[in-house]
Amino acid sequence: KDGKFQIAEEQLGNQLDIQKADRAIDTAIKEGLEQVSLEEQDCYIAPKVYKEDEKLKKECEDANKMLVAKITYDFGDRKEVVDSDEIADWIAFGDDYTFDLDEEKITEYVHQLGLKYDTFGLSRKFTTHDGQTITLKGGDYGWCINKKKTVAQLKELVLAGETTTVEPVYLYTGVCRDTNDLGSTYIEVSIAAQTMWLYKDGQCIVSTPVVTGNVSAGHSTPSGSVWAIDARMRDYTLTGQDYNSEVSFWL
């Protein structure tokens, strides 16, 4: 109620304690009474816990501390906010009136974040140096949330009642977290033209001939994909099972 957990008034109920009721009725008969009040004889089963129970009040207070948490996940030009509406649905109270966070629900929330924001190895639109829009598929570039560690991170922040902006824990990262995760600094390679274009902050600053893999020898360079640059070397010898090739610069 009013955005907080509150303890409801206990209900005395109408479930009889059979043994107490039997004794009360038996006593009334023996005493020649025409009526007996089972309520006055305390024959109804009492609530297990009352509103003023100190342990229950403490659990409710602790649960409300979590509702003040507000965690903003930063995805560059997009944000996802976890607030009291979401958190209230994650808090589960047990039969002993203690509470915990429902890890299955948190896991599902993080899973949905991954479906929405993970880009690792996915297809994406790309505008080439000459203005063509093509679709690049696969590769080893992109962002991928570490689901298990992000669940643990989110649970810890909620339990602490934190208000903060964070990034998920990532398994793979790119250079830009915006919707266009390639950013404005990248290298475009045309295998057909044997040419490379280096873009920095959206401007082409280098255009140079390159030599890609030898197709006839079975060492072709993968095409139509987005790849992270794992290394760059000068005056290097490329060594394979059946070849050695001297290069002045290699990516």
Model regions: which residues?
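Surface-exposed, secretory/extracytoplasmic low-complexity segments enriched in Ser/Thr/Asn/Gly/Pro
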Residues: 1-245, 249
